[in-house]
Structures are given as structure tokens and as C-alpha cells.
Amino acid sequence: MLSPALLKVSLNRRSSAPVPQDEKMMFHSRNRAASYLQPMIEDQELIGFNRDRRRSSGSIIVDSFELGNASPSRRGSIASGIPMDKKTRRKLSNPVSLHQYTEDPTLAWEMLKEKRPVKPVRQMRLDTPVKPDHVRFVCIGCTHGEQFDISKLPPGDVLLVAGDFTSCGLPNEVHNFNKLLGKLKYSYKVVIGGNHECTFDDTFLKLKQESEPKEMALKQALLSAIHSDSKGGISAKDLLSNAIYLEDNVIELFGITIYGTPWQPKVDNWAFNLSRGQQLLDKWNLIPAGVDVLLTHTPPLGHGDMMNNGQRMGCAELLNTVFKRVRPKYHVFGHIHEGYGCTTDGYTKFINCCMCNENLDLKNEPVIFDIPVHPHTKQFYIQNVKKIHKRFQKKK
């Protein structure tokens, strides 16, 4: 019930037939030894451009550090972890409406694909040096509690984890993952939950609706594990002491804003499941326009969301939110293991960073990308890791 075999049953219920060959060409081979994004022309612009873009259209940054004439230590607060309350939420300039075929993502994509370009992204080599005036992001997701060789993770500044780092969110799984994070040399590790982090979803264990026997058994086992492992009321989220956990909120690191959210279309009554349509759109409406990096568990429709049977699993409202309103430079996600790879719509880079393939085997490489910053900004954030972590926890 709590073994990987259970998870494989759930995954196999959603995939069967092979992907058409022409659709496969939209993604890079999983067997390639390189998974680094080659910066496109617009990546050479300084991150200050995005900062100005946010200022001019309603800033989402509150009490944040910005490099200026004064030294960083004298320019106000050193970081900002900003819950998306009414005061900090940006008014929607381009409201996204529900797609008429949102319940059928494969059909919805057939209607949208002419106006939503998808192109493969050229990738950099794994041994590309980290530059002093760039922030290196390393993206992983969907490890499902599997042990992997941390020595094979490339160097970088920020680790992004796109959810599903456990098989079902058992406290000992979270503890082991947190212990692994503590061994990594990244200055910051930013984590979101996925549908398998059942103990992270406050509503998952409280559901009273009728469930299948295996689902009820899973919930009972989780409740028992939480009760036996709880120490002073500490939640599973609190066990991630070596990471910055985001759930519908944003943090600024190196002057770069990162927004994280775990929700995804409902499949088999797992954690952070919501019905397609208005329920999910309400969550996407919380994402501020102008964030630099969007970290979700689910893919948007059309990017890294195709299963082996040719069906699409992405969210149409998330795609339209990204394309029409938020416009991040990078959108990082996981969830659909068969969709591993990188694409672009000409502005946003979409990264499906699932480490496990559809058989839950760790076959895929991490994916990295760089964002240029001022060297002094990078140095400041590297030197003040503990202070910035402490400030974020206080904001939460």
C-alpha cells in the first residue's frame, strides 16, 4: 500500500499507448547526457529589467533588498517572503477566463495550439561553469523518495524542487529528504509539495467523501504515522528545516522573485487536488504578474504534459495565466514523468524536471538555467543565507 508498487498502479492507470513520433520531437531525449538550458537572447538582459517591469505595473516586492548606493547591509531588509494576502496581491490586468473545454485538456490543446507556440529549447552542457554575475538554478522534481547520488547533482546557487519528493508524505520520508537537503551545498533550496506529499495538504486527511479501499488504507496509515512521529505538534512541513517551503507565496532571492504553488488537476484523490476550472483558476489568480520564476507541480497545457497514450494532462487555465498575465521568465514543474524536457513559447522557458521516468526509475538528469545579476548582489545573498532564511520563516 505504501510501497512504490502502489504508486506505479496509480501512474499506469493514466498511461498505456505510445506517444506519436511527431509529438515526441517536441521534447529532448531522456537519454541525453545534457539537461542545461542554453540562454536565449533576452536572457542577456540584466535582472534589473524585471525589477523595473514590476515597479511600473504594481510592485509585488515589499521591504525587499535592492542594490543601490548604500551597501546591502544598510538598504532595509535582506529578503522578503510575502504571503499573498489582499494587500500584496496585484490586481489582474488581464483576467483569465475559463476555457470551454477545460475538462478535456487534449481537446482544449487542439483549439489553443495555433495561438500558443511550443518550441524545443537548446540546452547547455552539464559542466558549464557558474559565472560570478549569474545565479545558477538547478531544477529537480518527482524523485518519489528514491535514493539518488547527490554527487551527480551539478553545482549551483539555488535548488528548485517541483514536488513529489516522497512516495506519500510519511514523516520519515520527509525527514530523510530534509537530511539529504542538508548535505547539498546550494545556498538556497526552494521546495513545493506535489500530489504525493499527502501530509502537507491540510485538507487531504480530513476528507469525509467515499474513497476506494486503498485510499482509505493510505489515509489511515498516514494518520497513524503522523501520530507516532509527531513531536510537540510539529507538522510535516516543519520537518523541512533545510529548505524554503513555498505554498501559494513568493520569495525574493538575489533580486529574483520565485513563486511556488503545489496544486494540480484532480486525479485519484491525491494531495493538493482541485477540480479543473474555477477551483484551479482561483489558485492561479493568486500568482502575481511579473514574477521571474514560477514553480508549480502541474504543467501548463501543451508544455511537458503529454502521457504515453497521447493524452494531455496540463491545465488550460494555468497556460493562459502564464501566457496572458504572469509572463515569468521561467516556469518549472514536474508531475507528468513522460513530459521531461524543456520548451519555450518565445518568451517563457518551460521546464519539466521530473527525475523519475514513467516507471519510477531515476533516469533523468537535473535541468539548470542562469539568470544574470549584479556580482555584489550575488555575493550578499551568499554571505547572508542564515539571516535570509530566518527572515523568511518570520514572515511566514
From Swiss-Prot:
Segments of this protein annotated with the region Disordered: 73-94
Sequence similarity: Belongs to the UPF0046 family.
Entry-linked Pfam families: Metallophos (PF00149)
SUPFAM superfamilies: Metallo-dependent phosphatases
Family annotation (InterPro entries): Calcineurin-like_PHP_ApaH, Metallo-depent_PP-like, UPF0046_metallophosphoest
CDD domains in alphabetical order: MPP_239FB
UniProt GO molecular function: hydrolase activity
Disulfide feature: none
Protein's UniProt name: UPF0046 protein T07D4.2
Domain of life, source organism: Eukaryota
